[in-house]
């Protein structure tokens, strides 16, 4: 993949389950290094789209290219290589409840490589620290953690193999406003420090205004618009207007404006 080439390129995608068509003629590009937020109403198929991109779905038509490779026709060897370049944080965290945080991260590390256990443990601690968790969280079980810490533990696991792209499904769902804001800043910091590309599904307007370079609106079975927020929030379509120009959208815009005004010059 060239530096200026789309990491994800989707053309003419159709996803359907029986007679129900979820997506029809959907196009989307995701550029290297960007944080793109995907929004849409309930039932618009945001998670279905994510699963199709990472090879967990079976689209009825269209093309999905990930790192320049056609997802549907990858060999098993190529698919394994591509999977190692993708970190995924599912909505429920999906940690193994019988394993400690460090052991959860270690599972991802040892799935593809035979590594000395001592090195695996040190790498797991590094990923746990990267995710903003205190090191004493390493020996705790998921049930002993708060909701925000579970999210961070799952994020540490998704970072285990040094991915190029992070897929996040509703990363701030269930977090209080302070926890959600801290998680947003963590994603921004990781993108900047590790050179990640981030594809996130969210309904959190504050997340969109705080960290997303572009927003893609999924409605009417396709991506209606994918652009910067100032373009998207003025897009002439009823759902988009209700979402961005309603009371919550206005509040998020005001909060983003206050935050921007409080930043030191040059940031």
What spans do the regions from the language model cover?
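The feature captures the beta-strand-to-loop junction immediately N-terminal to the Walker
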Residues: 39-41
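Helix-to-loop junction immediately C-terminal to a conserved catalytic motif
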Residues: 54
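Conserved ABC ATPase "signature" region
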Residues: 70, 118-136
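Conserved ABC ATPase signature
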Residues: 141-145, 149
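Conserved catalytic motifs of ABC-family nucleotide-binding domains
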Residues: 162
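Catalytic Walker B motif of ABC-type/P-loop ATPase nucleotide-binding domains
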Residues: 166-169
């Amino acid at each position: 993949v060239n530096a200026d080439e789309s990491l994800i390129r989707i053309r003419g995608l159709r996803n359907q389950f029986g007679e129900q068509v979820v997506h029809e003629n959907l196009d989307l590009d995701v550029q290297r290094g960007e944080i793109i937020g995907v929004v849409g109403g309930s039932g618009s198929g945001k998670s279905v789209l994510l699963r199709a991109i990472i090879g967990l779905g079976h689209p009825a038509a269209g093309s999905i290219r990930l790192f320049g490779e056609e997802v549907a026709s990858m060999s098993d060897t190529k698919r394994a290589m591509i999977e190692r370049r993708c970190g995924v944080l599912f909505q429920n965290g999906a940690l193994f409840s019988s394993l400690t945080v460090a052991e959860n991260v270690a599972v991802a590390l040892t799935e593809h490589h035979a590594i000395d256990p001592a090195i695996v443990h040190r790498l797991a601690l590094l990923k746990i620290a990267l995710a903003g968790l205190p090191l004493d969280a390493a020996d705790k079980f998921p049930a002993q953690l708060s909701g925000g810490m579970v999210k961070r533990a799952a994020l540490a696991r998704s970072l285990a193999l040094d991915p190029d792209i992070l897929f996040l499904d509703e990363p701030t769902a269930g977090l209080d406003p302070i926890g959600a804001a801290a998680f947003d800043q963590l994603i921004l910091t990781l993108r900047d420090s590790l050179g990640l590309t981030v594809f996130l599904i969210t309904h959190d307007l504050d997340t969109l205004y705080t960290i997303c370079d572009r927003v893609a609106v999924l409605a009417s079975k396709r991506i209606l618009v994918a652009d910067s927020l100032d373009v998207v929030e003025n897009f002439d379509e009823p759902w988009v207007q209700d979402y961005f120009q309603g009371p919550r959208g206005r509040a998020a815009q005001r909060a983003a404006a206050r935050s921007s005004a409080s930043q030191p010059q040059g940031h």
